[in-house]
A protein has these predicted regions:
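Noncatalytic alpha-helical scaffold of FAD-dependent oxidoreductases
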Residues: 1-143, 147-186, 190-248
Length: 248
């Protein structure tokens, strides 16, 4: 997104890549890769992509956007060496995000929520509104999976008020996910930050089955305790790197 693009402009390794391929100051960019059997098929896919973009943007507008050059927002990169530059920047997305020079950093706790694809746009807008409600913004980065766009809200984990915001954002985000029949951990597993919410997301019946299965397979709670079942609060401060009242 625009946050990552702006940060990449300040990093010598990626500055030239942004300047060479990013037109203007877009709110976000999407890298689309085609790997068909022939080059002509790849070019045909690119043509289709341009037509799709024009169709999406032109909804409700009378002017011919294709003639106005709106399809030029699709930047075609053919040489493999140039494609590698884009790929390296994409793979470094998280590192670029974490280079943010502030106490507040992108924090992972709702980063891989997934919803059915037809609801992805509405979910994304809803999640953005939740971030705004709590005075922050989300940093969108990494690959776009099926029904999953990776995002981390920017919070200061040394601040008790931002820790409280983290819980509030999680509760509202997971409720939004549930409304769309999605998953609160689409890729990365439940872990400490999400296991607490499993009873809400899966329902008491299924969560009780999780507990019974855990007791059968791991009666002494030896393997990975506190995950999936019997989980601590996601904002329990004894789990944090920075305790309440932390000062430099």
């Amino acid at each position: 997104d625009e946050t990552m693009i702006a940060l990449a402009r300040t990093i010598p390794l990626f500055k030239s890549t942004v300047e060479d391929y990013v037109k203007g100051n877009p709110a976000a960019i999407l890298v689309v890769e085609f790997a068909e059997e022939s080059w002509s098929e790849n070019l045909s896919k690119v043509k289709q992509l341009k037509e799709i973009m024009v169709s999406i943007i032109s909804k409700g507008k009378s002017e011919n956007l294709k003639e106005s050059g709106i399809d030029q927002g699709v930047v075609v990169i053919e040489p493999s060496s140039e494609q590698n530059r884009i790929s390296e920047m994409r793979k470094s997305g998280l590192n670029i995000m974490m280079s943010m020079k502030s106490e507040a950093k992108p924090v992972s706790f709702v980063e891989d929520c997934a919803v059915p694809l037809p609801h992805l746009a509405e979910y994304t807008h809803g999640l953005t509104d939740i971030f705004k409600k709590y005075g922050t913004n989300g940093t969108w980065y990494a690959h776009a999976s099926v029904g999953c766009l990776h995002v981390r809200p920017v919070l200061n984990m040394k601040s008790s008020s931002d820790v409280a915001k983290m819980r509030a954002i999680a509760l509202e985000a997971f409720e939004l996910v549930k409304r769309f029949s999605g998953s609160h951990s689409g890729e990365h597993g439940d872990g400490i930050s999400r296991s607490e919410f499993n009873p809400i997301m899966f329902g008491e019946k299924l969560n009780t089955a999780f507990i019974k299965l855990k007791k059968i397979l791991d009666p002494t709670d030896l393997f990975n305790p506190g995950k999936i079942v019997n989980a601590p609060k996601m904002d329990a401060r004894d789990l944090f790197r920075y305790a309440p009242g932390y000062q430099v």
